[in-house]
A protein has these predicted regions:
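Structural motif corresponding to the intra-repeat A-B loop/turn of tetratricopeptide repeats
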Residues: 77, 116, 154, 190, ...
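Generic helix N-cap/helix-start motif at coil->alpha-helix transitions
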Residues: 59-68, 98-106, 136-146, 172-182, ...
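TPR-repeat structural position
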Residues: 79-80, 119, 157, 193, ...
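Residue at a conserved register position within TPR or TPR-like alpha-solenoid repeats
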Residues: 73, 113, 151, 187, ...
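Long, internal scaffold/assembly segments composed of regular secondary structure
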Residues: 218-275
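N-terminal leader/linker segments that initiate helical-solenoid repeat arrays
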Residues: 15-17, 22-124, 139-142
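Solenoid-like repeat scaffolds
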Residues: 52-58, 91-98, 130-137, 165-173, ...
């Protein structure tokens, strides 16, 4: 009976990650980009390091006014169709626009489509943003990260990884923990468990090194990855950590199941009594 229970618990582990939510990306807000432009009409880059590597053209006043008009239609009047219509009028004149102006225009398209839950068109629009060059490096990196998140949400895991790697190619410092987690999620969903293991383990270790508690969802993901890799000792170790951090009955029961799988019946029985 105990062995059957153990097998059932182990089988459940394979599907445990399905209950973990994938964060919906917080897109950079078009109004923020417009606010930045109000302060940068002289064409300077967003940060000093960009000045050494990129010469970004100016967002001209007439283009700014049309983008602001589209934003007003979408945000204040709630008229998405009118906002899209205004942007399409701008797009019809894109042959006379510079790279930065086109990027800002597609950013607005993406923002409006995203808020209207038209994710396919939002993806298409944001992808066009990073096709335009030159644009401010910070703007490009923000868009690349949003593309990675939105592609993950849409199940485009290869694209998620590609956009993260493009982001990393522009990043001068270490890879942030949030990037590692998203990469691990994408590799896991792509059934590339070894790569997923590397990234989630680094993310958890980095977070703990800063004295912070890993997100519960990260540990659920790490546990699921180790399960797929048939590494029961590591699954057990993650569950021990989850029991200590979150003290949930389901984790106690799953830990008991893992002790049973590893032949440690005494610990299994002790855990079952505790649970």
């Amino acid at each position: 009976m105990m062995r059957k229970q153990t097998n059932t618990l182990l089988s459940a582990l394979a599907f445990a990650f399905a209950s973990a939510t994938v964060s919906v990306p917080t897109m950079f807000i078009a109004s923020n980009a417009i606010a930045q432009e109000a302060e940068q009409q002289d064409g300077q880059e967003i940060k000093a390091s960009d000045k050494q590597t990129r010469r970004v053209p100016t967002l001209r006043g007439k283009v700014y006014e049309q983008l602001a008009r589209a934003q007003t239609a979408a945000d204040e009047a709630g008229d998405v169709e009118e906002a899209i219509s205004i942007l399409k009028e701008v797009e019809d004149k894109s042959h006379s626009m510079n790279a930065y102006e086109k990027a800002m225009m597609y950013n607005f398209f993406g923002f409006i489509y995203y808020n209207n839950e038209d994710y396919a068109k939002a993806l298409e629009s944001f992808a066009k943003v990073v096709e335009q060059q030159p644009i401010p490096e910070k703007f490009e990196m923000t868009t690349l990260f949003s593309l990675a998140q939105l592609n993950l949400m849409q199940g485009n895991y290869d694209d998620t990884i590609t956009y993260l790697e493009r982001w990393e190619s522009l990043n001068a410092g270490p890879v942030p923990v949030k990037n590692k987690v998203i990469k691990a999620q994408a590799y896991y969903q792509n059934k590339q468990y070894e790569q997923a293991s590397t990234w989630i383990s680094e993310a958890v270790a980095d977070h703990e090194a800063e004295g912070m508690i890993p997100d519960e969802g990260w540990l659920i993901l790490q546990r699921a990855i180790f399960y797929e890799l048939k590494q029961p000792e590591k699954v057990k170790d993650v569950l021990i950590k989850m029991v200590k951090l979150f003290d949930e009955p389901k984790y106690w029961i799953q830990l008991a199941g893992m002790y049973g799988e590893l032949g440690e019946e005494r610990k299994q029985l002790a855990i079952m009594e505790t649970a």
